[in-house]
Amino acid sequence: MVTIGMNYFVIPGKEKVFEDACANVIETMGGIDGHEESSLYRQVGEGEPVYLISSLWAEEEAFKDFIASDAFKKVTNWGKLNILRGRPTHTTYKHD
């Protein structure tokens, strides 16, 4: 098992659009082989909107297949053009 933390920096005023898009993506991810669960979190307090999607995967390879998919690329390209302040970053946490 691995947990992937994906960090997103959202353009101020685009939070609702981002949250709605993430809800759809997380719902779609439910049908992907190797995906266990995902949750969306938002930074609290002042400052620019920052989000984290935490995803649990059966194995890291399943996550890599997902981010290499055309569907993922389409969503991230749309996000870069419309709602994100930069490229998302991710961190992998491996379970023993």
Locate the predicted segments by residue.
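Short hydrophobic/aromatic beta-strand micro-patches
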Residues: 9, 41, 54-56
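Short, surface-exposed ligand-recognition loops at beta-strand->loop->(often short) alpha-helix junctions
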Residues: 10-17
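Glycine-rich beta-strand-turn "strand-cap" elements at beta-sheet edges
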Residues: 2, 39-47, 76-96
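An amphipathic, aromatic/His-enriched active-site/gating alpha helix that lines ligand/cofactor pockets
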Residues: 27-36, 56-90
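Active-site-flanking beta-strand signature of metal-NTP-handling nucleotidyl enzymes
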Residues: 2-8
